[in-house]
Amino acid sequence: MEFLDDRERWLALPRVPRRIISLVPSITETLFALGAGRRVVGVTTYCTHPIDSVAAITKVGGTKDPDLEAIEKLEPDLIIVNDEENRHEDFSALEERGLPLYVTAPRTVREGIRMVAQLGPLVG
């Protein structure tokens, strides 16, 4: 399966992701709304909703200071980030570790709707 992210870079996944990390609070909520919440294994300290669900998920630092070693230890098969919320140097560091990264960058309501539509197939 191949997916084009908002950087216009292709991400190849061998199967539907089973171990997802979200480094964006709104994306964490979206993943739960899409029914993929049981496969989320890591979130930021700012990911607080859905309250009952994220409380037990491993925290991997903040949006601007993620713990790259903690992320790697979780063995994710998908990490979802945002072009404005997260730092580009962290994108590079995650990719250098060979971790699968999908970058979102919605800037309008229409693009936000498109992002949700793209996340559905991405997370199965």
Give names to the regions the model predicted.
Residues 1-124:
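N-terminal ligand-binding lobe of clamshell/alpha-beta domains
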